[in-house]
């Protein structure tokens, strides 16, 4: 006798039912909880994949209101450095600015500029006393690189400084009066406490929806594995200032993953931890009991994932989301829908099934900010995109996600493929279209907030003919829409 538990559904099996509405799409509130302590301004996360999320994409997504998760297919130092770059990209106050010594040569300063990507540094002596500041303008036309920072810096007597509690108007007034773009934050004894830049204020005004921490810095997440040896990686990421840690595995309902969550929670009781992936209520409860702040759902729905075909295991995504959300609804632990999102309507369906936000890979792969070079094939531009269970990704470090870290390279059993995806342009345009579709859904269903969509919206099950009718049919597309591409 077959032990069939129940029937399970995915995105193309259902549609949301329109309802009476007083909600206009442009008034819908897209903010949602990632964890109890982290609120997103849009319900979107980027996947921790080596062809999706590194520094550039994490910065761009945070500026739009979401969070990117830096992948782990790199050294500990490199991953921590990428987290630091996101945290330093935009700040209300840079609380720990990179400083230089007055005796540093301009040649060494030039290397520091190349490494960090910016050219302004407070200058401190051996006792950490603030003695000046040096900027790119100070050294722009200098040819003798053997000279030192002290020869060209703005000295202490001419520094523009404020105390930590200075108002925005006071800071802007000083910048205008002295025609400077950097103001240093100092203590009563003139110790350096931070730096404020005009560029950061301008970025804040241009991106008011940005997802930021309490210090005005962009938020960023990072992924780690569950296997032995990840303790050092976790410590380095926490030290780098990561906002949320992702303990990532293809099977989150396994003892090794649960133990990693328990150990991390014991060591860092206040650290937001996302754990996954699971596809059942039991798996979600186990991760929550272990100490997860949010649970990631999805086994095999991704476009580049072959887990369900290779192993025969998985649960269609709508049912998996609904089961996990129902199991955790009284605990206040959010569910993240990871995988299978092709259209903005799928985002709406995932949230209506109970997810607080979605994690996407293929939707963001191929953007300007995604890692990798643009490749031309038959006259069209592409970027590479591969699953973390592909042979290429596993050989670079993701094999532990699939419990194969002890396998030799020629003995790996892949659960994903390597491919290419059309070049899509800038991330902000993709997000605009996807969130526009979500807003329209909220207007059609009468849901003013993400929480209302999660709890009020109703589904109907549809047939194969229903999904065929839903797509474009009986016509040849002559001009592609930015939010609708088949294949």
Swiss-Prot record:
Keywords: CBS domain, GMP biosynthesis, Metal-binding, NAD, Oxidoreductase, Potassium, Purine biosynthesis, Repeat. It comes from the Bacteria. Mycophenolic acid (MPA) is a non-competitive inhibitor that prevents formation of the closed enzyme conformation by binding to the same site as the amobile flap. In contrast, mizoribine monophosphate (MZP) is a competitive inhibitor that induces the closed conformation. MPA is a potent inhibitor of mammalian IMPDHs but a poor inhibitor of the bacterial enzymes. MZP is a more potent inhibitor of bacterial IMPDH. GO terms for biological process: GMP biosynthetic process; GTP biosynthetic process. IMP binds at residues 303, 338-340, 361-362, 385-389, 415. It catalyses: IMP + NAD(+) + H2O = XMP + NADH + H(+). Pfam families: CBS, IMPDH. The keyword Oxidoreductase applies. It is an enzyme of class 1 (oxidoreductase). NAD(+) binds at residues 248-250, 298-300. One of its GO terms (molecular function) is metal ion binding. Pathway: Purine metabolism; XMP biosynthesis via de novo pathway; XMP from IMP: step 1/1. The active site is at residues 305, 401. Its EC number is 1.1.1.205. Its cofactor is K(+). K(+) binds at residues 300, 302, 305, 469-471. InterPro entries: Aldolase_TIM (IPR013785), CBS_dom (IPR000644), CBS_dom_sf (IPR046342), IMP_DH (IPR005990), IMP_DH/GMP_Rdtase_CS (IPR015875), IMP_DH_GMPRt (IPR001093). Belongs to the IMPDH/GMPR family. Homotetramer. Catalyzes the conversion of inosine 5'-phosphate (IMP) to xanthosine 5'-phosphate (XMP), the first committed and rate-limiting step in the de novo synthesis of guanine nucleotides, and therefore plays an important role in the regulation of cell growth. This is Inosine-5'-monophosphate dehydrogenase. The gene is guaB.
